Amino acid sequence: DDWLTPWEPQRPQHLLDPTRDRDAFTSRCHARDRDRQMGVAYGFGLFVGGRFCGEVNINGIVRGAMQTATIGYWIDRAEAGHRYVAEAVAVLFRFAFEELHLHRVEICIVPRNTRSRRVMEVLDIREEGTALRFLEINGTWEDHVRYAITAEEWDERAANFAAQWC
């Protein structure tokens, strides 16, 4: 299935696919757990009707003067378009600002990924511009549209997010 291929960095050829290899999956889980313990990244599964169908992640947490992180997400094709990702990202914002006490969260999206950009539109997240050749996707350095929300914006909108999404 090529549903996510246009948006995801290529897995190095020497690494086994965690969706097809139990040991690779176990290693991935251990790495995610280490990241969580170190406070540099957190991953959460999306479940619909008890079935795992996607993930939302907060990655690259930087402390000190920045207090920032990036968010990534994906969902199975069968569940796309039902606003599950928007709901999950809203909950992740709450976690980022109210539990992790970050100051800024950023989401970077390939410009042609209209479904992912729609999530940002639905949540009314501020677009900041385009980062040229930001991330390598399938061997090509792709531009990314940058979206962000700060703690001040969260404080102004938290009640609305909670009422609509959380």
Model feature map: region roles:
Residues D1-D2, L100, D124:
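Structural motif
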Residues D1-A78, T140-C166:
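GNAT-family acyltransferases
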Residues C108, R126-D143:
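Conserved catalytic-core motifs of GNAT/GCN5-like acyltransferases
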Residues P12, P111-R112, L135:
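Positions that flank functional sites
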